[in-house]
């Protein structure tokens, strides 16, 4: 049997081909390190697979920042994240990388970002109105269209990576640690994204994927928001994840997809996939979520959650969907800038605009006077965890 049929993305296909090599060749990137003594940790916000995250203060200007201390991983991966953040800096709703510092003793790198006064999504999503959901989805699309136009796929779109300051209606797409440059014809690692947001292409081991992976993940977010079902596809493992998807989208279209790309399904699916009809989106509507659902919401969702990655809406096409007409009209009335996606860019100069500066820090117990990373023991300092932080 010959291998899988190749696939090329429909938009922004050759962005990196037309850029100088130094734009995408992150392995050759030379990192410019800042001064770790400029930062003082305040409290731990959470931890992820690859990092620990702290709220901190830049003591040179008393601004709040978020510091992400990277766990030991391949230097190549760290360089990739830094290069991507630098390439995207100033883009609409992209988290701004402010500084890169390193502890001289442990050599642990840390990234300093603009501070966003985030509300935990599990609390926030329960309070959002129909208009709020449209508004924030549109803001995510600005970030996605921008990064895709810059030849970059995020590969980890999920609620945890979307920071929302609801009071100021400010959104930032964060955690670019799994992001990668798109090169047509390149085969990528399918072990990316979080289970509930993994596209079918990842679950069937199709490696020639592209920006459209992010659009599937966005569709999963939209479904969870409008149907108030988090997560929408709740698989117990990666195999069960595809089964959960097939129970909604049906098995017929799944087999059409794997036939089209000549994909060989893992034999483990033989016993668990079964046969399922395609379900109508209306069946997920009930009294508790009907105020968030509209014909245009379901039409938009249907055009994102497609097995065939080539038939999903692109980010730019999505922004032109009727679901966003009211948002677009309101933003036009308010006179958004002409930036791609219609959002004011965040330059390093105005990075902290709109974020009130914090007063001179009072003594923080064991942290008073500590640099961001204690030389001998970068992760061992007793920083109080934030309430509700992911541990």
Swiss-Prot record:
Domain of life of the organism in this record? Eukaryota
Please, what other remarks does the record include? Can use both ATP and GTP as phosphoryl donors. Phosphorylation by casein kinase 2 has been estimated to represent up to one quarter of the eukaryotic phosphoproteome.
Q: How does it assemble?
A: Heterotetramer composed of two catalytic subunits (alpha chain and/or alpha' chain) and two regulatory subunits (beta chains). The tetramer can exist as a combination of 2 alpha/2 beta, 2 alpha'/2 beta or 1 alpha/1 alpha'/2 beta subunits. Also part of a CK2-SPT16-SSRP1 complex composed of SSRP1, SUPT16H, CSNK2A1, CSNK2A2 and CSNK2B, which forms following UV irradiation. Interacts with RNPS1. Interacts with SNAI1. Interacts with PML. Interacts with CCAR2. Interacts with HIRIP3.
Could you tell me which CDD domains the record lists for this protein?
STKc_CK2_alpha
Report the catalytic activity.
Answer: L-seryl-[protein] + ATP = O-phospho-L-seryl-[protein] + ADP + H(+); L-threonyl-[protein] + ATP = O-phospho-L-threonyl-[protein] + ADP + H(+)
A Pfam family annotated for this chain is Pkinase
Record domain Protein kinase: where: 39-324
Report what the protein is called: Casein kinase II subunit alpha
Active-site residues are 156 (proton acceptor)
Query: Where found, per UniProt?
Result: Nucleus
Q: Which family does it belong to?
A: Belongs to the protein kinase superfamily. Ser/Thr protein kinase family. CK2 subfamily.
According to its UniProt entry, the protein's GO biological process terms are: apoptotic process; double-strand break repair; negative regulation of apoptotic signaling pathway; negative regulation of double-strand break repair via homologous recombination; positive regulation of aggrephagy; positive regulation of cell growth; positive regulation of cell population proliferation; positive regulation of protein catabolic process
Q: How is its activity regulated?
A: Constitutively active protein kinase whose activity is not directly affected by phosphorylation. Seems to be regulated by level of expression and localization.
> Which sequence positions carry the modification called Phosphothreonine?
344, 360
Cross-referenced SUPFAM superfamilies, in alphabetical order?
Answer: Protein kinase-like (PK-like) (SSF56112)
Keywords associated with the record: Apoptosis, ATP-binding, Biological rhythms, Cell cycle, Kinase, Nucleotide-binding, Nucleus, Phosphoprotein, Serine/threonine-protein kinase, Transcription, Transcription regulation, Transferase, Wnt signaling pathway
> What function does the entry list?
Catalytic subunit of a constitutively active serine/threonine-protein kinase complex that phosphorylates a large number of substrates containing acidic residues C-terminal to the phosphorylated serine or threonine. Regulates numerous cellular processes, such as cell cycle progression, apoptosis and transcription, as well as viral infection. May act as a regulatory node which integrates and coordinates numerous signals leading to an appropriate cellular response.
**EC number from the UniProt entry:** 2.7.11.1
Region annotated Interaction with beta subunit sits at 36-41
Question: Which of this chain's residues are annotated to bind ATP?
Answer: 45-53, 68
């Amino acid at each position: 049997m010959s291998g899988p049929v190749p696939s090329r993305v429909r938009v922004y296909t050759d962005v990196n081909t037309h850029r100088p090599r130094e734009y995408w060749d992150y392995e050759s990137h030379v990192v410019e390190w800042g001064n770790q003594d400029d930062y003082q940790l305040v409290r731990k916000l959470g931890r992820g697979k690859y990092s620990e995250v702290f709220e901190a203060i830049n003591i040179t200007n008393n601004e709040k920042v978020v510091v992400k201390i990277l766990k030991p991983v391949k230097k190549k991966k760290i360089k990739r994240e830094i290069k991507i953040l630098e390439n995207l800096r100033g883009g609409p709703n992209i988290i701004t990388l402010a500084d890169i510092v390193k502890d001289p003793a442990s050599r642990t790198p840390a990234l300093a970002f603009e501070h966003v006064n985030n509300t935990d999504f599990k609390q926030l999503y329960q309070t959002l109105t129909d208009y709020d959901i449209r508004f924030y989805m549109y803001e995510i699309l600005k970030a996605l269209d921008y990064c895709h136009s810059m030849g970059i796929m995020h590969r980890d779109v999920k609620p945890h990576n979307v920071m929302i300051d609801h009071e100021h209606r400010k959104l930032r797409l964060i955690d670019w640690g799994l992001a990668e440059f798109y090169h047509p014809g390149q085969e990528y690692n399918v072990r990316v994204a979080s289970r509930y947001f993994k596209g079918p292409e990842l679950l069937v081991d199709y490696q020639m994927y592209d920006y459209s992976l992010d659009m599937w993940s966005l569709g999963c977010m939209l479904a969870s928001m409008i149907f108030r079902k988090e997560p929408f596809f709740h698989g117990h493992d990666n195999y069960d994840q595809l089964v959960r998807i097939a129970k909604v989208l049906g098995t017929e279209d799944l087999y059409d997809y794997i036939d089209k790309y000549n994909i060989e399904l893992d034999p483990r699916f033989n016993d668990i996939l079964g046969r399922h009809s395609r379900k109508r989106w209306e069946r997920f509507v009930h009294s508790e979520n009907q105020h968030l659902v509209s014909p245009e919401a379901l039409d938009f969702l249907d055009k994102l959650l497609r097995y065939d990655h080539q038939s999903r809406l692109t980010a730019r096409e999505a922004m032109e969907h009727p679901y966003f007409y009211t948002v677009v009209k309101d933003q036009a009335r308010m006179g958004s800038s002409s930036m791609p996606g219609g959002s004011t860019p965040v330059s390093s100069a105005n990075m902290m605009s709109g974020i009130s500066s914090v007063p001179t820090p009072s003594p923080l117990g064991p942290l008073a006077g500590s640099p961001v990373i204690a030389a001998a023991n970068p992760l061992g300092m007793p920083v109080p965890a934030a309430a509700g932080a992911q541990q």
